Design a protein with these regions (language model features):
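A beta-strand edge to alpha-helix "cap/lid" segment located at domain peripheries
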Residues: 2-34, 39-129
Length: 129
């Protein structure tokens, strides 16, 4: 097994993950559709489980999403054609409350393209800023 991903592949995976956090890209169904694997599942920070179709439907109509601050984005190879991305997001509400969420995504290499097959967000803390 390859010990690590090359820098170009890491950069591609990071770009793709960040694209899914970009408000304008999230509303572009074709763009998101191209990044989600057919069996994509998300466990949101609320604990709700989202299917691929539910995710596509939600993102197409999302109007209040603001891009969070992203920290500590790391990529690790799990096996041939399987990568894990981990990071944390910080999002500040209108009331000044900041939510820290730990996030992880599993990406698979499918017919030469990286696709996200799993994402989970877990709230790690809240504070007033």
């Amino acid at each position: 097994m390859q010990a690590d991903l090359d820098e170009a592949t890491k950069a591609e995976l990071k770009r793709s993950e960040l694209l899914l956090m970009d408000p304008s890209a999230r509303r572009n169904r074709e763009r998101v559709d191209a990044l989600l694997s057919n069996n994509f599942v998300e466990i949101g920070s609320s604990g709700r489980v989202w299917t691929r179709q539910a995710t596509l439907d939600l993102l197409a109509t999302e109007i209040t999403y603001t891009q969070p601050q992203i920290e500590d984005l790391a990529v690790r190879l799990l096996g041939p054609g399987v990568a894990l991305l981990t990071y944390r997001t910080l999002r500040k509400s209108m009331s000044g409350e900041q939510t820290i969420t730990l996030r992880s995504s599993i990406w698979i290499l499918d017919s030469g393209s990286w696709k996200i097959c799993f994402h989970q967000g877990t709230v790690a803390g809240k504070s007033m800023v």
